[in-house]
Every structure is written in C-alpha cells, then in structure tokens.
Amino acid sequence: MPDKKKENDVIGSIEFKKFFDRIPQNDPRKKEFYEIFKILKEDCLQGDKIPHDRWPALYISKYRIKNLWRYTLRSGWRIIYTVLSQKDDFIVCILEAFSHKDYEKRFGY
C-alpha cells in the first residue's frame, strides 16, 4: 500500500485570525474558507503565484515573505498566503483575506 501524502499545515497571521474569528458561523464565507483550508492542506500550490514585482511592500517588511500566492474563492473573495518550508514539510500561512475591491486597493490596481 503506498504511503499517504502528508498534509500541509495551514495557519493564519494574527490579522487573518482576528478577521476569521469575527465571521459568524452561519456566514457562507466561513464554510468557503474551511473548504479552501482543506484544499491548501492537500496542495499548497493550488493558488496563483503572484509575481515579485506586484508584492505589496507591507508583506515584504512585515512578514519577510519569499513567495506570495492568491486563491480566489467562489464568492469573489481572495486569500493571500505564503508557503514556508521546514525540512520536508510545508506550512501555508494565510496573511489576509479581501473582497475584490479591497484586494485591488492593497495591490494598487
């Protein structure tokens, strides 16, 4: 029997955790976020890699990121995350979640 692939850890920044904890349990976004967490646990590269020249300076200075990814939810919301590696393990760190409008503001579109 083949070995089962190890799942990635999915964590959130302090800001994301505060945002997520404020979402009511019955809000459809909460369910959608849980679905995305599951997807990223299985494959941390499911999102779209954001080119370095588009990274907001805030992420570089605050989180010292080495990569940046975006995952667009069905609702149009986006999560921004970075992938950290430790030995053979990957950790997905969700930095922020945005509506489309707020995402465009953060990235200067």
Where are these regions (language model features)?
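Enriched for short, Lys/Arg-rich terminal
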Residues: M1-E7, K18-R22, I65-Y109
